[in-house]
Amino acid sequence: MSNTKQAPKVGFVSLGCPKNLVDSERILTQLRTEGYDVVPSYDDAEVVVVNTCGFIDSAVQESLEAIGEALAENGKVIVTGCLGAKENQIREIHPKVLEITGPHAYEEVLGHVHKYVEKPTHNPFTSLVPAQGVKLTPRHYAYLKISEGCNHRCTFCIIPSMRGDLVSRPIGEVLAEAKRLKEAGVKEILVISQDTSAYGVDVKHRTGFYDGMPVKTSMVALCEELAKLGMWVRLHYVYPYPHVDDVIPLMRDGKVLPYLDIPLQHASPRILKLMKRPGTVERTLERIQKWREICPEITLRSTFIVGFPGETEEEFQMLLDFIDKAELDRVGCFKYSPVEGAKANELPDPVPEEVQEERFQRFMELQQQVSIRKLARKVGKEMLVLIDEVDEEGATGRSAADAPEIDGLVYLNGETGLKPGDMVKVRIDEADEYDLWASLID
């Protein structure tokens, strides 16, 4: 009979965006390394960690509900993440929470776990922690966070008050992590941060070192080095700064996926100014045209806000005109929602909810027509697809134009012999508003 003491269990709940997911992965990796058994439930857990989101009101509500559920089911709860920056708000509703920390407070979270759950002396799990750490994504893709915080002060956003100003990770550290992911079988890396294009600004783009070689701390240099690893490299949260133009040739040459996620937010100069967002419509359209001339295969994704305080019908029409002219491939749209602490809340002339809804519907109808046009042009074309899921009906994957969770899918009906992580060549047979259907090419 074994007298090995069972590892203490820590429950874990992760909410919010991919950047928060990466924070969760880091905490989980350390907990596993120290010998804790991390479980996705409250049953038998000696304490529960809830990594929260606090960006918009609906996310705050979801986080508060998750904390409440953990308290009801378990009773011992440690809170971290963006909402943790608003400790008073949490304590007011959930006074029995044990400890609260803000975002990326990894060491503090671990210290709190040690306080309430004895640190294992015998560690049966250390040898089971993979070199790339614990990942919450499927094995074939992973998020690579290159910085924390943001230097922008957009009036609708409170991220800087939660996560602070931009702090870039050392480029050698980022590239070493990417290499470990490659060695673990990852086929696609999704580069994320609050502002990927600002990578290195805080350290004046100083030279770092990777494998003994000097590398400049910049987005372009990072992309050039990541390209050497031979994975799909997808760029998210890229502001339209001039130096972004330097990445487009890398996309044309197949070194980085021809995909840019650029949160433009609006097209009216006045609304953009009220939002404290960079860029002008004319210049943005010019650059999009230039990018497409250099790299015809480029996929452009963006997000927009409708119903921002003071938005007139004329200004909303400017946004619709931009959507029609720009023909962006993938678009997300949000109705403006006041976020506690955001400067935009102080702006006059809030747009009534029914007007917001009506504009949202008009926006999405137009974008759907754009998407139908764009995807119809892909029928008959050949492309590579990365398989995400396989079931009894067939396989589902994504092309270079599709990021996980937010973009379209490629369906391969009847292809049950494939497995997640397979990279296959297909011919597109059909298209609808957002997705494609394809056949394997032998």
From Swiss-Prot:
Gene3D superfamilies: Methylthiotransferase, N-terminal domain, Nucleic acid-binding proteins, tm_1862 like domain. Keywords: 4Fe-4S, Cytoplasm, Iron, Iron-sulfur, Metal-binding, S-adenosyl-L-methionine, Transferase. [4Fe-4S] cluster 2 binds at C150, C154, C157. It is an enzyme of class 2 (transferase). Its cofactor is [4Fe-4S] cluster. [4Fe-4S] cluster 1 binds at C17, C53, C82. GO terms for biological process: tRNA modification. One of its GO terms (molecular function) is aspartic acid methylthiotransferase activity. Residues 8-118 form the MTTase N-terminal domain. Binds 2 [4Fe-4S] clusters. One cluster is coordinated with 3 cysteines and an exchangeable S-adenosyl-L-methionine. It is found in: Cytoplasm. Its EC number is 2.8.4.4. InterPro entries: Elp3/MiaA/NifB-like_rSAM, Methylthiotransferase, Methylthiotransferase_CS, Methylthiotransferase_N, Methylthiotransferase_N_sf, NA-bd_OB-fold, Ribosomal_uS12_MeSTrfase_RimO, rSAM. PANTHER family: RIBOSOMAL PROTEIN S12 METHYLTHIOTRANSFERASE RIMO, RIBOSOMAL PROTEIN US12 METHYLTHIOTRANSFERASE RIMO. Belongs to the methylthiotransferase family. RimO subfamily. This is Ribosomal protein uS12 methylthiotransferase RimO. It comes from Aeromonas hydrophila subsp. hydrophila (strain ATCC 7966 / DSM 30187 / BCRC 13018 / CCUG 14551 / JCM 1027 / KCTC 2358 / NCIMB 9240 / NCTC 8049). The gene is rimO.
